[in-house]
Amino acid sequence: MTTPTSVRERAVPAPAGRRPERGARWRRVGLRLVALVVLLALWQLVIVLQLWSPVLVPSPAAVWRALLETSGTHDGVRGYQGHTLIEHLGISLRRIFIGAGAGVVAGLVVGVLMGTLPWVRVVLEPAVAFLRTLPPLAYFSLLIIWFGIDEAPKLWLLAIAAMPPVAVATASAVASAPTALVEAARAIGAGRGQVVTSVVLPSALPEILIGVRFAFGIAYSSVVAAETVNGLPGIGGLIRDAQRYNQSDTVILGLFAIGISGLLIDAGLRVLSDRLAPWRRHA
């Protein structure tokens, strides 16, 4: 006679279910590695065939040498302009996390208010839409006039650039919260604040995190452009300074540093999204 325990044991397909997932993950990794190798091969082929001047398109080896030179001390010179590549990148990331972090918090507050209070949406939606359509560098000059050329205008730029996408995503997600869940929470005596924190925000979390990912992407592109003004140390300042002296290998190295760190930040936000909202996987 079959016992309930044996039926349950045979009904557990977890190990078999995980194998296809792992296989698909490794296939994606393999395809990306192949694509990377192909791109490097094409890059080297351009150099071998001398399709462009090495001054304009440096070889992978030249970029590698630039990495070594900017990562340590060579001929008595430390890194680039006294700072190593990782220090330049770290300073830019610090600006992003402080400035964009403030913008994300502001966007969450504005978005929740817009999504829960119709009159707030009527008042604030045009202003948020106006800021959203402005290129961040369009008001950077005004921020320099107001705050000078040090850190303050850069941080304000990042905060203002990061706020609109989070506010729009949050407002839309909060307004679309399941009515049945909201009414059920109110029926058991939950106040407005409890409904927002216990029902509305958890249901809106996936869309909010998508807005946060967009905000950090906008902030990254904005800080690199902002660092062209008194941006040393900083990865944008490094690129701008190297461009002045036609150091294309250092410029490309800086671009790689930006791209790789940006991918890592986005991957981290995606993992955080999957952890906080496992019921909704992002493509």
Map each language-model feature to its residues:
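Transmembrane alpha-helical segments of polytopic membrane transport and secretion proteins
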Residues: 1-37, 267-283
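Periplasmic/extracellular loop-to-transmembrane helix junction in inner-membrane transport proteins
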Residues: 49-101
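Alpha-helical membrane-interface segments at transmembrane helix boundaries
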Residues: 86-98, 121, 128-131, 148, ...
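Transmembrane-helix boundary motif in ABC transporter permease subunits
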Residues: 98-128
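Generic hydrophobic transmembrane alpha-helix motif, especially the helices
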Residues: 129-165, 172-173
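Glycine-rich helix-loop "coupling/hinge" segments at transmembrane-helix boundaries
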Residues: 145, 174, 221-258, 277-283
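Transmembrane alpha-helices
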Residues: 156, 160, 192-226, 249, ...
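Short cytoplasmic-facing helical segments at TM-TM junctions of multi-pass membrane proteins
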Residues: 166-211, 235
